[in-house]
Amino acid sequence: MSRPDWDEYFLGIATAAAQRSDCERSKVGAVVVKDRRVRGTGYNGAPAGAAGCSTCPRRLSGAVPGVSDYSSGATRCVAVHAEANALLYCDREDLIGATLYVTREPCYACSNLIAASGIERVVYPKES
């Protein structure tokens, strides 16, 4: 039996974090790691205190996950991405020179946040 390398290990933690998401379209997890220690985790979902996927207007309108336009009107998705949540719950000191592990390739907006955060390296599965 072989042990996973550090990247595999922390991607596994990101995968576990993704399971907390109640998004019916895509479950994404992220982990901030510095000096081989977890500094923060995040998963995609509605902001704290807001309606999650099961009660959001987008779902109640009959929008089909992965098919409907999620960018406007009653079907606008309010979810905060996993990467953003992980970054928001870290101290700035924890981000400088850290690695971000994500269960899929970050979107354009998250890539900009990551670039501005001080994260030095981003790891995600090749098949994402």
Curated annotation (Swiss-Prot):
Annotated EC = 3.5.4.12
Q: Which InterPro entries match?
A: APOBEC/CMP_deaminase_Zn-bd, CMP_dCMP_dom, Cytidine_deaminase-like, dCMP_deaminase, dCMP_deaminase-rel
The record places domain CMP/dCMP-type deaminase at: 5-128
Protein's GO biological process: cytidine deamination; nucleotide biosynthetic process; pyrimidine nucleotide metabolic process
Which parts of the sequence bind Zn(2+)? Answer: 81, 107, 110
One matching Pfam family is: dCMP_cyt_deam_1
Q: Which superkingdom does the taxonomy of this entry point to?
A: Viruses
- Please list which residues make up the signal peptide: none
Which residues are named in the active-site annotation? 83 (proton donor)
| Molecular function in Gene Ontology | dCMP deaminase activity; zinc ion binding
Which reaction equations make up its catalytic activity? dCMP + H2O + H(+) = dUMP + NH4(+)
Q: Which UniProt keywords apply?
A: Hydrolase, Metal-binding, Nucleotide biosynthesis, Zinc
Protein family (similarity comment): Belongs to the cytidine and deoxycytidylate deaminase family.
The record's annotation in PANTHER family points to: DEOXYCYTIDYLATE DEAMINASE, DEOXYCYTIDYLATE DEAMINASE-RELATED
Q: Can you say what this protein is called?
A: Deoxycytidylate deaminase
Q: Point out the gene that encodes the protein.
A: 36.1
